[in-house]
Amino acid sequence: PNDAKSLSVLPIQNRTFKAGLETDLSEQLKGLLQSNSSVKLLPAGQADLKLSVTLLNLELPSSGLSKDQISTGTQAVLKGNAFLEDRRKGNTVWEEKMIHVKISESEGIQIENTSSLTLSGNIRELINRFAQNLYDRIFTNF
């Protein structure tokens, strides 16, 4: 957008109860962006565009998922928001107020013990989906 050639990903804000999600998301997102030859990743003060992401909520069967969601096979839901700002003009070029990704039983992914859940398997898949969803929205919109 706006003939921008570069992008910076600001530190991701994590408002979920699960530490480490922001680090994993940052790695996934930067990996996707680095694989795109049409955009160059630069520090915030040098990039044309700044991407801000906030993880708002991680819902699991033990915390946050409704009985209806659980009964229909939902295993985990991650919600967040993002906005893209043009540093040169100081305006928001794009905003996504609710990014929502989920994992369901039908996908063959099981979350057995949520109290010992680590950043592996299921949660990584949720983060991968969030990063891909965000990436697709940025590059599909423009």
Q: Where are the regions that the model predicts?
A:
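A structural "domain/chain start" motif
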Residues: 1-31, 35-46, 88, 127, ...
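Second-shell loop/turn segments in exported
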Residues: 11-18, 113-123
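Surface-exposed short loop/turn segments
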Residues: 36-39, 46, 50-121, 132
